[in-house]
């Protein structure tokens, strides 16, 4: 058991180091630093984000709601980074459209991803904004423990970030997702090492 724990730590560190080393340094990393813990919270949504669950769990929705209430631009940033996160997130099975559905699926009041370009300080007509405007209409899914509600729009103001921000944060998110996946394996399963 102790050997498996050490192996998990080493695998996590290797994943983070390799992805961070491959990613170019990003300007304006302040938003990435600010939203770092929010990536960790979103790992509670991994089952929904990978399509293993048809609805987000209550823990997932509580985490998403906390992000939205505390700093809504970080929720936008998480979605944006999933879009620009590259093959590593796709290899884990993260479905971009599921992340985009989170505010609606968790039935957050006063939340709409159409506000994300403004919160992130990107031009609504830019290609970076397309992830939010092209996918703004999603079918709501009732999450576990929530009753149906109609999302409204947000009036929160936010800072700015470029689409390239947060590669190190994405690496951390990928590592956390990988660890979450491995921890869900039955105890008798070995990792082949």
Curated annotation (Swiss-Prot):
Q: Could you tell me in which tissues this protein is expressed?
A: Up-regulated in the epidermis of stems and leaves. Expressed in the epidermis, stem cortex, vascular bundles and mesophyll cells in root tips, cotyledons, seedlings, leaves, caulines, flowers, siliques, pollen, and early-developing seeds.
For the lipid attachment GPI-anchor amidated aspartate, which residues are annotated? 165
| SUPFAM superfamilies, A to Z | Bifunctional inhibitor/lipid-transfer protein/seed storage 2S albumin
**Membrane-related topology note:** Lipid-anchor; GPI-anchor
Q: Which residues form the signal peptide?
A: 1-22
One MF annotation (Gene Ontology) recorded for this entry: lipid binding
Q: Which residues form the propeptide?
A: 166-193
- According to the lineage, what is the superkingdom? Eukaryota
Which cysteine-cysteine pairs are annotated as disulfide bonds in the entry? 35-76, 45-60, 61-106, 74-116
Q: Where in the cell is it found?
A: Cell membrane; Secreted, Cell wall; Endoplasmic reticulum; Golgi apparatus
Region of interest: Disordered: 138-161
Q: What is its main location?
A: membrane
- Print the keywords alphabetically: Cell membrane, Cell wall, Disulfide bond, Endoplasmic reticulum, Glycoprotein, Golgi apparatus, GPI-anchor, Lipid-binding, Lipoprotein, Membrane, Plant defense, Secreted, Signal
| Gene Ontology terms describing biological process | cuticle development; defense response to fungus; lipid transport
Provide GO CC annotations from the record.
Answer: endoplasmic reticulum; extracellular region; Golgi apparatus; nucleus; plant-type cell wall; plasma membrane; secretory vesicle; side of membrane
InterPro entries membership = Bifun_inhib/LTP/seed_sf, Bifunc_inhib/LTP/seed_store, LTSS
Q: Which residues are glycosylated?
A: 110, 135
- Gene ablation phenotype (knockout): Reduced cuticular wax load on the stem surface and in silique walls, with altered cuticular lipid composition (especially C29 alkane) associated with diffuse cuticular layer structure. Increased number of plastoglobules in the stem cortex and leaf mesophyll cells, protrusions of the cytoplasm into the vacuole in the epidermis, and enhanced susceptibility to infection by the necrotrophic fungal pathogen Alternaria brassicicola. Increased susceptibility to penetration of the epidermal cell wall by the non-host mildew fungal agent Blumeria graminis f. sp. hordei (Bgh).
The known PTMs are summarized as: O-glycosylated on hydroxyprolines; noncontiguous hydroxylproline residues are glycosylated with arabinogalactan.
Stated role: Lipid transfer protein that, together with LTPG2, binds to lipids and functions as a component of the cuticular lipid export machinery that performs extensive export of intracellular lipids (e.g. C29 alkane) from epidermal cells to the surface to build the cuticular wax layer and silique walls. Involved in the establishment of resistance to the necrotrophic fungal pathogen Alternaria brassicicola. Contributes to pre-invasive defense against some non-host powdery mildew pathogens by preventing the penetration of the epidermal cell wall by the fungal agents (e.g. Blumeria graminis f. sp.
Q: Which family does it belong to?
A: Belongs to the plant LTP family.
Name the chain's protein: Non-specific lipid transfer protein GPI-anchored 1
Q: Which organism is it from?
A: Arabidopsis thaliana (Mouse-ear cress)
């Amino acid at each position: 058991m102790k050997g498996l724990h050490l192996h998990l730590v080493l695998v996590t560190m290797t994943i983070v180091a390799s992805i961070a080393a491959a990613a170019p340094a990003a300007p304006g990393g302040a938003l990435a630093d600010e939203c770092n813990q929010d990536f960790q919270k979103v790992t509670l949504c991994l089952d929904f984000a990978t399509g293993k669950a048809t609805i987000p769990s209550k823990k997932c929705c509580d985490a998403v709601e906390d992000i939205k209430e505390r700093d809504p631009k970080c929720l936008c940033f998480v979605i944006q980074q999933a879009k620009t996160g590259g093959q590593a997130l796709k290899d884990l099975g993260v479905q971009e459209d599921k992340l985009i559905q989170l505010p609606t699926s968790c039935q957050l009041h006063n939340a709409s991803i159409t506000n994300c370009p403004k919160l992130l300080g990107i031009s609504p007509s830019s290609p970076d904004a397309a992830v939010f405007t092209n996918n703004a209409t999603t079918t709501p899914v009732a999450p576990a423990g929530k009753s149906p509600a109609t999302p409204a729009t947000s009036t929160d103001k936010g800072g700015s970030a470029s689409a390239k921000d947060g590669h190190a944060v994405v690496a951390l998110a990928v590592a956390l997702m990988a660890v979450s996946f491995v921890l869900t394996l039955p105890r008798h399963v070995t990792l082949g090492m």
